[in-house]
């Protein structure tokens, strides 16, 4: 039953994160949907690590493939937080909309991290190899 609760908690956290994102766009006070582009970063953030885990070589010491994937993932995550800040600085969105979108990003990326943490021991071939 613990697995069902974990999946339900992850789903709820994802819904809360997306709710903050939609609130930052849809409230009449803000009136612009440009922060919705952050969803692109949510989708792209796990891709480099998934690819790196799939093609990981057995090497002693550090692994360049994993390090490159972590670097690219870090760039994607920072871009997800930077986009609303740049839009707010340019005057495209309000500062409060930027706060709502970045709050949603914190929750969504926390959900993505929790998903990979909870499913790290699944027996699915090389996809289940630990990254850290």
UniProtKB/Swiss-Prot annotation:
> What is the superkingdom listed in this entry's lineage?
Eukaryota
InterPro entries in UniProt:
Vps55/LEPROT
Keywords of the record, alphabetical order, are: Endosome, Membrane, Protein transport, Transmembrane, Transmembrane helix, Transport
User: Can you tell me where the transmembrane regions are?
Assistant: 7-27, 32-52, 68-88, 98-118
One Pfam family recorded for the sequence = Vps55
From the UniProt record, give one GO term of the biological process aspect. Answer: protein transport
Q: Give a yes or no for keyword Cytoplasm in this entry.
A: no
Which residue windows are coiled coil?
Answer: none
Q: How does it sit in the membrane?
A: Multi-pass membrane protein
Q: What does this protein do?
A: Involved in endosomal protein transport.
Identification of the protein by name = Vacuolar protein sorting-associated protein 55 homolog
- Species per Swiss-Prot/TrEMBL record: Caenorhabditis elegans
Q: What is the lineage of its organism?
A: Eukaryota, Metazoa, Ecdysozoa, Nematoda, Chromadorea
């Amino acid at each position: 039953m613990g697995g069902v609760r974990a999946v339900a908690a992850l789903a709820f956290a994802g819904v809360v994160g997306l709710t903050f994102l939609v609130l930052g766009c849809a409230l009449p006070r803000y009136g612009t949907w440009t922060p919705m582009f952050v969803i692109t970063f949510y989708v792209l953030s796990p891709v480099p690590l998934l690819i790196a885990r799939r093609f990981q070589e057995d090497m002693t010491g550090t692994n360049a493939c994993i390090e490159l994937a972590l670097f690219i993932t870090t760039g994607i995550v920072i871009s997800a937080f930077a986009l609303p800040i740049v839009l707010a600085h340019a005057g495209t969105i309000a500062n409060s909309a930027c706060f709502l979108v970045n709050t949603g990003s914190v929750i969504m990326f926390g959900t993505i991290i929790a998903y990979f943490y909870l499913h790290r021991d699944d027996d699915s071939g090389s996809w289940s190899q630990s990254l850290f």
